[in-house]
Amino acid sequence: MAMKWSLNTYQTAQNWELDELIRQAKAAGFDGIEFLMDFGQKHGVEANADAAWLRTVKEKVDASGLEFASVTSCASFHSLNDAERAEAMDRAAKSIRIARDFGCQHVRVLGDRVPEDGTRETVLENITHCMRELARQAQPDGITVSMEMHGSFTDPNLAVPLAEAVEMPNFGLVFNSQFRENAQTGWRLPPDGSIRPLYDRFRPHLTQIHTHQMERPDQFPMYQELFRLLKADGWNGYVAMEAAYTGPDPEKVLRLYTALFHTLAA
């Protein structure tokens, strides 16, 4: 089975109503849609969305032949405030229930920021506990919960030990295609520019991938190596286009990204 291509409803798609989102995703050749939540996007998929609307979303997406690639919550768990973490847990738990009702097997959440002060270990312990509990909730429905390698967790020296500490078979990491070639602290891309050491760290926990501006000359060689490694491993998960383009011709731009994806994945 080949890798699949999904449209994350980031900036390019954030103002499209559901019907237009589906039309654009189909026209550009995506296999699925990754519904980004918590920003009030026009698709209307939110933790507290009306149940009737969520049923409509499922019916329309199913009828289109597209898949629900991910229910993507922006709930994060770095706060030292118990009430704030509890609120984030509630939103994430609702996202798991939405994924179950959609027939979606993936929910993404965030870590997200780890301080460099005396609270560091407490924050990491809190995040680990929350991730383990969410994975436990999702497990009976066959749903994978993933933390994105975002914020402080672009550093594999933080993300990978946390994934190991969660120690749940349905928990993993979304690689956010941050290759850390210019990192000032923590793990940094080696001088030869190969991403292999980074890939080898996160690969055992990899569930999905987010891509950004793959066409940039300074990024393209790293994406080429990433896809070579994925193909050599036979990885067949979802790769998302987290598109930030907001210009006048999104359909053309998304089609070009689709062509680039298929070229790299071939």
Roles of regions detected by a PLM:
Residues 3-17, 75-89, 117-123, 187, ...:
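Active-site mouth loops of central-metabolism enzymes
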Residues 14-25, 84-97, 189-200, 222-226:
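Short, acidic/polar
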Residues 249-266:
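C-terminal helical cap(s) of enzyme catalytic domains, especially alpha/beta-barrels
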Residues 30, 66, 99, 104, ...:
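A structural motif
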Residues 10, 32, 71, 129-228:
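Acidic/histidine-rich catalytic cores of soluble enzymes
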Residues 19-38, 103:
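Catalytic domains of carbohydrate-active enzymes, especially glycoside hydrolases
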Residues 7, 25, 33, 61, ...:
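Conserved, mostly hydrophobic/aromatic
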Residues 55-67, 77-175, 180:
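Active-site acidic/histidine proton-transfer and metal-coordination neighborhood
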